[in-house]
Amino acid sequence: MNVSKTEQDMRKAIEATAGNFATIRTGRASTSLLDRINVEYYGQPTPLKTLATITTPDASTVLIQPYDPSSLRLIEKTILESDLGLPPSNDGKTIRLNIPPLTAERRKDLVKVLRNLAEEGRVAVRNIRRHAIDEVRKEEKDAKVSEDEARRLQDEVQKLTDKSIQQIEKLFEAKEKEITTV
């Protein structure tokens, strides 16, 4: 049983959760808002950032300039169908997303989405823990490790799990504060 691999997997789960948090809009324009957007381009789901230049000319605008002008309509349609809640404005060459100030109701909705993303991260960490502990038990059953060593490894995995869940909780609290601050 390799504890460092378990630690690495948990770190990846935390990074994935942080990446998901970055896609939640906070009232300020950010290119990371569009990180999860995949456009159906020639039958393939393609990340928007590979189809267009995405910039933030000011604090309340995201500008999308497609490399291929024919993809403009597809990008616009995908953004409309996404959970961003931002209506795109298409001028024929670029798409603008104007980021309105968040309403109290929208802030509450975003915190709910954030809470769900945090829970997904915690579940991922727990699944990694379960897999690691199953591996330790299998090694103990196969007499590859002693009962004491198995207990020590399980305790170590549990400590990593607690630490990882605590990190996800800190990320959640910081992002929640960012969203709820007017």
From Swiss-Prot:
Which CDD domains did the record assign?
Answer: RRF
Give a GO biological-process term.
Answer: translational termination
Q: Which UniProt keywords apply?
A: Cytoplasm, Protein biosynthesis
- GO cellular component term of the entry, any: cytoplasm
GO-annotated molecular function: ribosomal large subunit binding
Q: Which InterPro entries match?
A: Ribosome_recyc_fac, Ribosome_recyc_fac_dom, RRF_sf
Q: Does the keyword Cytoplasm apply?
A: yes
Main location (coarse class): cytoplasm
What are the coiled-coil residue ranges? none
- NCBIfam families, sorted: frr
Q: Which family does the similarity line name?
A: Belongs to the RRF family.
What is the designated name of this protein?
Ribosome-recycling factor
Q: Which organism is it from?
A: Gloeobacter violaceus (strain ATCC 29082 / PCC 7421)
| Gene name of the record | frr
